[in-house]
Amino acid sequence: MGETLGDSPIDPESDSFTDTLSANISQEITMVDTEMPFWPTNFGISSVDLSVMDDHSHSFDIKPFTTVDFSSISAPHYEDIPFTRTDPMVADYKYDLKLQEYQSAIKVEPASPPYYSEKTQLYNKPHEEPSNSLMAIECRVCGDKASGFHYGVHACEGCKGFFRRTIRLKLIYDRCDLNCRIHKKSRNKCQYCRFQKCLAVGMSHNAIRFGRMPQAEKEKLLAEISSDIDQLNPESADLRALAKHLYDSYIKSFPLTKAKARAILTGKTTDKSPFVIYDMNSLMMGEDKIKFKHITPLQEQSKEVAIRIFQGCQFRSVEAVQEITEYAKSIPGFVNLDLNDQVTLLKYGVHEIIYTMLASLMNKDGVLISEGQGFMTREFLKSLRKPFGDFMEPKFEFAVKFNALELDDSDLAIFIAVIILSGDRPGLLNVKPIEDIQDNLLQALELQLKLNHPESSQLFAKLLQKMTDLRQIVTEHVQLLQVIKKTETDMSLHPLLQEIYKDLY
């Protein structure tokens, strides 16, 4: 496995990761001494005392490097704060002008508003073959299997293409007064009646929604399908209650949900727009305007910007671990596992969950910080000197692809539970009960995705692939920390962060 990140001794007054996490699980006390990786979900910089970070007993025990090669840096890097502060009124005016210019260049991803419905929260034990699945939605025109939501209705590829060609080429068919029946085998016999059927069921050129559907239509469809499933499988009612419990726990555990984050990113909120940080001047202004949580400017003005940001992320990570731990305890069966296995599952799972939920705070241009009060641009983060400028780019690349799946909070609630209950983590003592719980969660996830995203037949397989991608991101993150270990001789790393990364990949 991987080497220990940081060879310095852990402060005798600090608990080990295992002891702290065990106490948190068994005694329901708040965990505040566990550290996690860079840029966790719901990131914010706060006023926690950083004296522990300045204690060099926690620093890397490495001889100073006399030379560091930064020749490959393409963007400018920034050295130390403080900077000379300009008159506040002048600074605000310049910021407003620059912000208008920058915001005009930012293309925020379209909102796909997360929505929760009890009808979408289903567990179902039996695995159904696609051909016999209750989720095989019929084409509204001919009754064939629908491939998605096209031109305002569920339609198969054949009828979608027929309608598109008719509209695009402005085709006029010979009138037929026979009112021909349109079904899978006869749909090509009478084009006039087929087109009339398309119009009758609601197909419209003004309702182009390839792969999407209105929320009202989705809820109606889910209600019909859920009713059918309940009649065929009475156990689904109990499973739905269980799924709702998971969703409720998710909402309680994670204050900044994807629904809230996307509302901020797309401007669909009554709250004040986030303060955009895109360069050093806007960063200084942001420190005055944003209620940062983990760093106060007066405490850390002497430190380099990249290090200040990195240290602030460490303290927010403590909160992230607490949130994830609380959620894990709500997963049915988790607290009944061996206590050592609970600790191991969280040790390996929290990183992957942090990056999963971090994606909710991101678009291709930047990331929300400080509980949505600020928005730090991707280019600014890349401009930080190496290796710090390299930390976030893999997370952005993952987030753009992950967000394309258009999951909502009800999907994520099950997905992160699946991540936690991974029976292949190294060092587990009793794998069987863990796999049993995960199998149930996987069945729940598969059915949830079929119900919530009926137009995306391959979504379950794509999401499972993301679990592999997340592990690769964690591995790359550990490798970057190894670089910091070798090059940043005066960089303090929280001792519990070293504990978590010990023997991790």
From Swiss-Prot:
Cross-link type Glycyl lysine isopeptide (Lys-Gly) (interchain with G-Cter in ubiquitin), residue numbers: 252
GO biological process assignments? cell differentiation; cellular response to insulin stimulus; fatty acid metabolic process; hormone-mediated signaling pathway; intracellular receptor signaling pathway; negative regulation of cholesterol storage; negative regulation of inflammatory response; negative regulation of transcription by RNA polymerase II
* Residue positions, PTM Phosphoserine: 112
Please give the residue ranges the record annotates as the region Interaction with FAM120B: 205-280
Q: Name one GO molecular function term.
A: RNA polymerase II cis-regulatory region sequence-specific DNA binding
Q: Name one GO cellular component term.
A: nucleoplasm
CDD domains referenced in this protein's UniProt entry, alphabetically: NR_DBD_Ppar (cd06965), NR_LBD_PPAR (cd06932)
Cite the entry's keywords alphabetically: Activator, Biological rhythms, Cytoplasm, DNA-binding, Glycoprotein, Isopeptide bond, Metal-binding, Nucleus, Phosphoprotein, Receptor, Transcription, Transcription regulation, Ubl conjugation, Zinc, Zinc-finger
* Listed PROSITE patterns: NR_LBD, NUCLEAR_REC_DBD_1, NUCLEAR_REC_DBD_2
DNA-binding region(s) in UniProt: 136-210
Superkingdom of the organism of origin:
Eukaryota
Function comment: Nuclear receptor that binds peroxisome proliferators such as hypolipidemic drugs and fatty acids. Once activated by a ligand, the nuclear receptor binds to DNA specific PPAR response elements (PPRE) and modulates the transcription of its target genes, such as acyl-CoA oxidase. It therefore controls the peroxisomal beta-oxidation pathway of fatty acids. Key regulator of adipocyte differentiation and glucose homeostasis. ARF6 acts as a key regulator of the tissue-specific adipocyte P2 (aP2) enhancer.
> Which PANTHER family does this entry report, sorted A to Z?
NUCLEAR HORMONE RECEPTOR, PEROXISOME PROLIFERATOR-ACTIVATED RECEPTOR GAMMA
Present the record's domain note: The 9aaTAD motif is a transactivation domain present in a large number of yeast and animal transcription factors.
- Subunit notes for this chain? Interacts with FOXO1 (acetylated form). Heterodimer with other nuclear receptors, such as RXRA. The heterodimer with the retinoic acid receptor RXRA is called adipocyte-specific transcription factor ARF6. Interacts with NCOA6 coactivator, leading to a strong increase in transcription of target genes. Interacts with coactivator PPARBP, leading to a mild increase in transcription of target genes. Interacts with NOCA7 in a ligand-inducible manner. Interacts with NCOA1 and NCOA2 LXXLL motifs. Interacts with ASXL1, ASXL2, DNTTIP2, FAM120B, MAP2K1/MEK1, NR0B2, PDPK1, PRDM16, PRMT2 and TGFB1I1.
Please identify the protein, giving its name as recorded.
Peroxisome proliferator-activated receptor gamma
